[in-house]
Curated annotation (Swiss-Prot):
One GO term (biological process): translation
UniProt name for this protein: Large ribosomal subunit protein uL5
Gene from which this protein is expressed: rplE
UniProt keyword Lipid biosynthesis present: no
GO terms assigned for molecular function: rRNA binding; structural constituent of ribosome; tRNA binding
Keyword check for Ribosomal protein: yes
Length: 179
């Protein structure tokens, strides 16, 4: 059991039951999955870029990502239907908690001029989305071996019914929200 899983069971669940008045511990919001997505627009012209993006995401997530393909042809972007244009991976259970722990305690403090994450990134249904502009903030990525700086999208899916419940859940995990 990871550190954040243990913290969730021993500290977060009782705190959220006390705050929101849940009658059952199973009604307390929990993390379902974390989805990492990296769109690589240059992959249409250079296939090596996509291979490097897949390798970076595999190092960051600890599992092999799937390559996403374009759904439609867009002439202005010079892509066709079915061409590989990015990669994504979904983390669940212990890998999810390990990634969240590294994100909160190691990666986000390494971001330049970091003053916290804006709390308006919730979607209205208890899920949280954020972006990271540089993949080099993760300790698994060697800065000297990176061919290009690429960002990624991080989507945290919870069982919370409202944004207030989801924010309380992430606050309990010491998520660095801006005041």
């Amino acid at each position: 059991m990871t550190r954040l899983e243990n913290m969730y069971k021993k500290e977060v669940v009782p705190a959220l039951i006390k705050r929101f008045g849940y009658s059952n511990p199973m009604a307390v919001p929990r993390l379902v999955k974390i989805t990492l997505n990296m769109g690589v627009g240059e992959a249409a012209t250079n296939k090596k870029v996509l291979e490097n993006a897949v390798a970076d995401m595999a190092k960051i997530s600890g599992q092999r990502p799937i390559v996403t393909k374009s759904r439609i042809s867009v002439a202005s972007f010079k892509i066709r239907n079915g061409w590989p244009i990015g990669c994504k991976t979904t983390l669940r259970r212990s890998k999810m908690y390990e990634f969240l722990d590294r994100l909160i305690n190691i990666s986000l403090p390494c971001v330049r001029d970091f003053r916290g994450i804006p709390p308006r990134s919730f979607d209205g249904r208890g899920n949280f989305n954020m972006g990271v502009k540089e993949q080099v903030v993760f300790p698994e990525i060697d800065f000297d071996a990176v061919d290009a700086i690429r960002g990624m999208d991080i989507a945290i899916t919870t069982t919370a019914n409202s944004d207030a419940e989801a924010k309380a859940l992430l606050d309990a995990f010491n998520f660095p929200f801006r005041n």
